[in-house]
């Protein structure tokens, strides 16, 4: 589906057929037509195009496939965009060599050619075509001349009928933009449809990308008004745009990173949960409606002196349970993972109560030392200047150098009051912090969580999605496509608050949020502003046990997560849209917006709404698209054939729908509460052998910038199943080195099976390992060079002792466990051989026998038809286990009821369906159903209405009354 790509600065359409040089269309009357008088090469990487009226346009090449178009009709020369305060979008070294740069005139066109692209400019109209020389396809074509208006520049490109568009930054609730318009604007809007961290960059499946080189807001319309046009504009009075031409998403993202910098690789502790609150300002007074503390009493918090106990960072004033230290101990007492802590909120809290800045720094250092002793790093919120100002009181003074150098701060979270202006303001601030953290922090890797980002933010910081309200399903729903879209925009490091910063008091939403975010980079408990305390144990059982389970699972998956995080620095993001691995018409749009791939092997389908939930939160999930191939339920081991859309997938409260691709190789670690608890002398690989597969595991010191200099270790792991059902797993010698690398490690394999293999053997280099069979799990754990057949692995390993949930039996599919003694993993390959391998789970869906008749009375009744939804119904069929519907070329399967809702349809459009019954003997004949959606309820609404109020808008902009978005009503 992906064509070779070019990043262009003009309105270009994507077209793939051959074309004549004179075939560029005439411009629309009234637009600013410019004739081309000539062109000349002004240096080895740039061409100046001379237009009539003594105007000039520069094409500056940053490589054979990336060029910049600059035009300022007021006479300005090529330059960086204006930035106050100073900031740069481009990385320090954004250029690559240009192998050739030729300028010719052929007929009615000026032709500019490099080793990879050809740009043809019509002399009469100055309209462009950009051709990828790899296959001579037109990847972008300008549809109309550049239009300069007062404070605004725009142009348009042609769009192909099968072309899709992605990017634009954190566009809440969206990732696929075909037929839509997106704002490249810092709206500080944290809900669906808003823009949290815009990026002036998009790319197309047609093979090109565009990045506007500006700090001004803009708008990109991908055919919302004119189906075959892409209209682009920014509030800038000159044109400065980069075009990239390349083959597919990874290549285009790499082009973007070449220009603006690669995303940061988060330190390892960042993958553990963080806790954020203020512990240096408030007063706590006993109140029966307050929060329950360890002394058995309830207290309410106040920012004003209410006669209660004043909190502090270190609990030295007989206020321990209200201190920052108590947070560290509280997580430990509840056996909950915690990687980092922010003890100030930046809004009047500070981090000390002395009358000098140095005294407060010492107070912060005391907490940091205590936290690090317990494996936890310390960070700070920032809503004010980073450097000392004499006019500010000691309480609120900041000195980022001393905070990093003396107190050991290793995390920084920006806030609206500091970077809320966005654009260059936000980029300037995090640039300063990143450099200080590395320089004064012993080459520490910066861990910055920012908001209001822009192009270039990714090279310094991850992104936070803003202040949202928890306790509601909408909070989970819109974040799923938001996270996907962030990765497609070149920002793979995205996070949001666990169950929101505000609201709460809904343990079911809380648990479901912890579950799906296990398969995301970062987790933040933003405490102190919600309806309940924001701890993973806040709601008691069974929620505490389930949250602990998923937090421990996240820690076990760190080697996998860290490997795909390193890949995201120059390749695919960690959280992947389905089309990145499985491009087809179904995945390219928004049909799969509520599921994603976590790296190459995990498919995650979060519970984002109540479908058929009982009072305990046990539910089902509809609409899970499993691509071609075989997929395995990560918890139960059930096998699913791909190429279908599964429905009524069981999701009891403890279970997140997660599927593993058959053939997966998953590097793991021992469960831990922080990085210090990871066993550096053990490596674990869980495998689902199928065909021939491989995975490269990446590791480094996890804390410094040395990875940028290549200080890291890569280990290739291969798995192969032969035609005799014998498995060979080869762990190749580790390649590379880093400070602290432990070469001598034990190796553990977890092979998923459905019956005990007939033979197990292992070799390290040329030496065979004498394996013994363990007679129990305890025996296996206590020895080395052993194997054990675990018939029913206990998945419920982390329940609270004595809780009812601890008694719940949750078993997975059988596993063959193999543990080899420590050896030098750089010296020789480790090879595991398994004879008589079987992974053939019992059928769970097709259980009944008997003849099946075609479903009767299949129809969409009047009450089941709406403008954007249709719900076919039918009569139950005897002997049926489930039903299938064919719709839009896709097969919807495992439908347990006799109705099914189709959403996101077009108004006043006819649709056809086919329904059949299924059991283990086969399926019935199809029954056809036809229906038409009803009229658009906004059909006669008048577009373009604007309004104003005589007083300041409260909560939301008045524009939401007129924006045609029903969710804003």
Which residues does each PLM region occupy?
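N-terminal accessory segment at the very beginning of proteins
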Residues: 21-268, 307-310, 314, 321-323, ...
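Catalytic-domain carbohydrate-binding cleft regions of carbohydrate-active enzymes
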Residues: 24-29, 136-656, 661
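Short beta-strand segments within Ig-like beta-sandwich modules, predominantly Fibronectin type-III
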Residues: 561, 891-897
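Predominantly extracellular/luminal regions of secreted and cell-surface proteins
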Residues: 676-695, 937-964
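Pro/Thr/Ser/Gly-rich low-complexity, intrinsically disordered linker/stalk tracts
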Residues: 846-878, 907, 925-938
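Short beta-strand elements bearing conserved aromatic residues within extracellular beta-rich modules
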Residues: 883-885
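Hydrophobic core positions of the immunoglobulin-like beta-sandwich fold
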Residues: 900-903
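Beta-strand-rich modules
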Residues: 905-921
